[in-house]
């Protein structure tokens, strides 16, 4: 990281048990900017990089996501081909609204439209009905939908999120 031009004392590198990974935290006084991203990524490898500055953190996440995007596209495409969901895949530009596109994604995955996805702002949210406490049933029902949404959101650079994580805390 020093070879990347970061200032000594401007970053920390330590193992974080709650992450089960090494986390590199880059402070504002490290002197990092977007020009350093390639070097930082190479130096960090697969470790977690966090910037204390929110804008820098978001910019770095965008940078890292773009690097991973081609590999992710291939992985998702292969998954869709394996499950028979590649042919006839809905195209975003064929729909007037994000809501209509989300409903088409559900239908393509064999899920009733408007039953598990909803739109909020410029993003699609996974919000399935809470009618199944059986994990195996849940996975069987929604794994194809999540594969379809993962491909669509990566391809079209759409925001995607989950609703209902508060149940994990119970």
Language-model features and meaning:
Residues 1-170:
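Long, low-hydrophobicity, acidic/polar, solvent-exposed interaction domains
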């Amino acid at each position: 990281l020093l070879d990347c031009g970061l200032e000594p004392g401007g970053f920390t590198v330590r193992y974080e048990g709650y992450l089960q990974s090494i986390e590199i935290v880059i402070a504002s006084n490290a002197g990092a900017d977007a020009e350093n991203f390639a070097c930082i990524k190479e130096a960090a490898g697969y470790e977690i990089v966090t910037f204390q500055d929110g804008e820098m953190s978001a910019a770095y996440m965008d940078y890292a996501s773009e690097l991973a995007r081609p590999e992710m596209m291939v992985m998702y495409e292969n998954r869709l081909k394996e499950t028979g969901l590649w042919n006839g895949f809905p195209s975003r530009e064929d729909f007037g609204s994000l809501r209509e596109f989300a409903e088409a994604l559900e239908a393509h995955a064999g899920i009733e439209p408007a039953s598990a996805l909803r739109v909020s702002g410029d993003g699609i949210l996974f919000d399935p009905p809470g009618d199944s406490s059986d994990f195996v049933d849940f996975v069987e029902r929604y794994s194809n939908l999540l594969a379809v949404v993962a491909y669509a959101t990566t391809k079209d650079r759409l925001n995607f999120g989950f609703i209902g994580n508060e149940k994990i805390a119970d």
